[in-house]
């Protein structure tokens, strides 16, 4: 009797485990948005095919939850490794969003004063004809010149943000601070250097302490091309014939605050959720994050802390950011009132392209 009972238990266990299907950890898929997600997949795959992008990941958040996240294509063409939603990719200019959060948190804590000068924190920085206050840097209104092509992709090893200041610190300002918007990576890199000096901590440590650990963004770190990083996808570029090739070696550490962060679509979507809902960001903090500044002629800035501020054709507020760097690119789109966040990242050099996320947003918005 005991033997028969034991056999029945074993059979029951085998039936239970035999009937279990392996969970697909490469995707999050909320069936209540099935139609919208299928249209999203179609649009994103079409975008990748048109632009010969080997791989990417995409994520969508609605009302505080990730409703869709997936890796599509290849993380490595050479090794035929599929892209997953966890793979890390270069996000280019979108890195500024993380830098601005650290900056505003340091202001909130009283460690940085927006009205203090750059020279107050970096005494060796040359004096300028006009007061160069910190508050101009995250708005790209400092008058610091735009980087040249060769400065965007310095050859060799460039491990220091502080060393990267030498490219521009002795140049004259192109206009009085606060007059015009001119996007330059030098603004964000200088802001990162100031934060390092004020806190006596390196930028990767600040990113971890003020953003990724608190918000549990497990796949967002500063890139370091000279060491292995688990989950980092391979990077690709295109030659003169439009053929996809391996991207050349590029050490982005000197521009970590502006272009040098690795992340993925899901972490970007989680960042959007946190900005909209997390207690870590007070209402006052969020207002400052998206607050335009005044420009010459009583105009308002179109950017704030790395975010493009705009409205769509239906009059809805939209906050967006896109980025491109050697071997990668990304974009994030937020509709605050609709609690909608859309993000993607790819492993091919692309121009700053917001088109895919705007097209996808239409599937989730009621006109």
Language-model regions: role of each:
Residues 3-10:
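Sec-dependent signal peptide recognition
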Residues 21-26:
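Bacterial lipoprotein signal-peptidase II cleavage site
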Residues 49-57, 79-136, 175-184, 256-259, ...:
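Short active-site loop at a secondary-structure junction
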Residues 16-19:
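C-terminal motif of bacterial Sec signal peptides marking the signal peptidase cleavage site
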Residues 30-89, 113:
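Short, conserved catalytic-motif segment at the N-terminal edge
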Residues 312, 317, 349-367:
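Short, gly/Ser/Thr-rich active-site loops of penicillin-recognizing serine hydrolases
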Residues 331-348:
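Short, well-ordered beta-strand elements
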Residues 129-324:
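Short, surface-exposed loop or secondary-structure junction motifs
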């Amino acid at each position: 009797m005991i033997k028969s009972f034991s056999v029945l238990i074993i059979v029951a266990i085998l039936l239970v485990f035999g009937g279990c299907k392996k969970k697909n950890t490469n995707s999050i898929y909320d069936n209540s948005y099935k139609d919208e997600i299928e249209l999203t997949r179609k649009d994103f795959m079409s975008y990748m095919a048109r632009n010969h992008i080997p791989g990417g990941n995409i994520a969508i958040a609605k009302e505080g939850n990730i409703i869709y996240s997936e890796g599509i294509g290849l993380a490595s063409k050479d090794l035929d490794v599929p892209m997953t939603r966890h793979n890390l990719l270069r996000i280019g200019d979108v890195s500024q969003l993380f830098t601005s959060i650290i900056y505003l948190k340091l202001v909130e804590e009283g460690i940085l004063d927006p009205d203090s000068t750059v020279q107050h924190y970096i005494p060796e920085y040359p004096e300028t004809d006009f007061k160069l206050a910190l508050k101009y840097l995250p708005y790209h209104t400092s008058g610091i010149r735009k980087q040249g092509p060769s400065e965007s992709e310095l050859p060799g090893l460039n491990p220091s943000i502080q060393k990267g200041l030498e490219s521009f610190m002795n140049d004259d300002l192109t206009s009085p601070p606060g007059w015009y918007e001119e996007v330059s990576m030098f603004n964000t890199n200088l802001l990162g250097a100031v934060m390092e000096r004020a806190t006596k901590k390196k930028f990767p440590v600040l990113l971890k302490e003020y953003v990724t650990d608190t918000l549990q963004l497990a796949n967002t770190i500063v890139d370091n091309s000279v060491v292995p990083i688990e989950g980092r996808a391979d990077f690709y570029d295109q030659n003169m014939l439009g053929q996809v090739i391996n991207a050349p070696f590029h050490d982005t550490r000197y521009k970590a605050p502006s272009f040098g962060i690795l992340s993925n679509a899901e972490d970007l979507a989680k960042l959007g959720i946190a900005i909209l809902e997390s207690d870590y960001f007070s209402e006052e903090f969020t207002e400052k994050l998206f607050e335009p500044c005044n420009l010459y002629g009583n105009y308002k800035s179109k950017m704030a802390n790395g975010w493009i501020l705009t409205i769509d054709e239906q009059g809805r507020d939209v906050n967006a950011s896109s980025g491109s760097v050697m071997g990668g690119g990304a974009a994030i789109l937020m509709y605050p009132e609709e609690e909608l966040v859309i993000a993607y990242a790819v492993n091919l050099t692309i121009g700053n392209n917001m088109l895919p996320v705007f097209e996808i947003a239409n599937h989730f918005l009621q006109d």
